[in-house]
From Swiss-Prot:
Protein name: Cell division protein SepF
One GO BP: FtsZ-dependent cytokinesis
Gene3D superfamilies the UniProt entry points to: SepF-like protein
Family recorded in the similarity comment: Belongs to the SepF family.
Lineage: Bacteria, Bacillati, Cyanobacteriota, Cyanophyceae, Synechococcales
SS bond partners: none
Main location: cytoplasm
HAMAP family to which the protein is assigned, alphabetical: SepF
Subcellular localization(s) per the UniProt record: Cytoplasm
A Pfam family recorded for this sequence: SepF
Chain residue ranges for the region called Disordered: 149-183
Keywords: Cell cycle, Cell division, Cytoplasm, Septation
Amino acid sequence: MSIFSRLKKVVAGDDYLDDDYGTELEYEDGLEPSDSTLDRGGAIAPIGSFDDGDPFASSNVIGMPGITSAAAEVLVMEPRSFDEMPKTIQALRERKTIILNLTMMEPDQAQRAVDFVAGGTYAIDGHQERVGESIFLFAPSCVTVTTASSEESAAPSVMAREEEATAPAAPSPAWGTQDAING
């Protein structure tokens, strides 16, 4: 062997190490494809094809019952009698937000209507908010209601200078003094 052939064997490796075993596939010649598995071009079509008319087969999106992807709908209702209140509850069940203007009703009927719709809203875990005089907002659980007045009450208030002078000073805690630590 020449020096070049030895170098070639070392760098390229031996042919018997590079032989791919098991790459030959065994086929059974006894089975012929049936007409149902052949497509128009004569090739074999997959048996469990996802194109069997299922429109959601290629999509990973799973629909949730009762929830639509359409825009949220807000209904403004001005009932004249209590008899119109079941329509309000049905709209809430259909996940629609309701603005209920009760200025057209008598005060006792309006109170009864608000109690009825508030009970229905509570039953579906919805939200209710008073918007104005005899005007109420009822929303299903899928709608978040935030008011500016609740944000203002959560914000710290600034006391006036006169209030600061009259406000009593908070007592210092006993556990924070030096005498309490030394005993």
